[in-house]
UniProtKB/Swiss-Prot annotation:
InterPro entries: bHLH_dom, HLH_DNA-bd_sf. It is found in: Nucleus. One of its GO terms (cellular component) is nucleus. It comes from Arabidopsis thaliana. Expressed in leaves, stems, and flowers. Homodimer. Interacts with FAMA. Residues 65-76 have a biased composition (Basic residues). The lineage of its organism: Eukaryota, Viridiplantae, Streptophyta, Embryophyta, Tracheophyta. The gene is BHLH71. Transcription factor. May be involved in the differentiation of stomatal guard cells. Residues 152-169 have a biased composition (Polar residues). This is Transcription factor bHLH71.
Amino acid sequence: MTLEALSSNGLLNFLLSETLSPTPFKSLVDLEPLPENDVIISKNTISEISNQEPPPQRQPPATNRGKKRRRRKPRVCKNEEEAENQRMTHIAVERNRRRQMNQHLSVLRSLMPQPFAHKGDQASIVGGAIDFIKELEHKLLSLEAQKHHNAKLNQSVTSSTSQDSNGEQENPHQPSSLSLSQFFLHSYDPSQENRNGSTSSVKTPMEDLEVTLIETHANIRILSRRRGFRWSTLATTKPPQLSKLVASLQSLSLSILHLSVTTLDNYAIYSISAKVEESCQLSSVDDIAGAVHHMLSIIEEEPFCCSSMSELPFDFSLNHSNVTHSL
């Protein structure tokens, strides 16, 4: 008991002495010397470190990023090579197309006469080729008609030597009408409407008429006897047939774009390209063919004493109902 009491008293004295001692207690950690490279961290430094944002997670190491780049490099280079090859292929195809187009245009220009190819640009060459083809078409019609005319004339001279002079004068004109009429494709009945086709033809004893309509562009071909084709007739007070026809078409809101005439003996082929204006009341092929047929009928039947276009005994401003009923 005595030993226990002494030990307890000694422990109490030790605690009291340590509590009342002016020098603080130093732990074993405090007593150890600090290394030179260590940095003493203050409370402010700890608070700053705690307030900083944490580093982004899942950040791959540099070695992994390098490996991915090495994997993607061949694929990126392959795509660039394909794009470059495709671009070069397109350039080569376009260059080849332009070269072929220039060759064709140069050949086309060399085949045309000088009046039809006065400029070297593409639009002028193509437009000149169109005009030249139209001129060749009219020349072909004239030559075919002349050929049949000469053949029929030779047959009539060799087969019969006892024909009357009147018959010999009428025969040369009949082959022209037959040979020229073969270029007008379709027969047309004015009492019936051709709703399915885009081409109609009117055939009467005095003329053959063919009309083709493509959207707002109309092509009109007329085979008719010429009136006023001699200088003596042109000098008279009666205007020519062509001027009347042009005036009548313009009065129907058909703007003339191109007009050409091919003649043989006293027959003429009028090839007219016209634009159908918005104010035109003739909306179909049959309407245009009927109106032109009506005009030519009135021109053929009009008296010879008319001295000007204002004195013509008919009105050119025909509407759709008048044209239909007049036929």
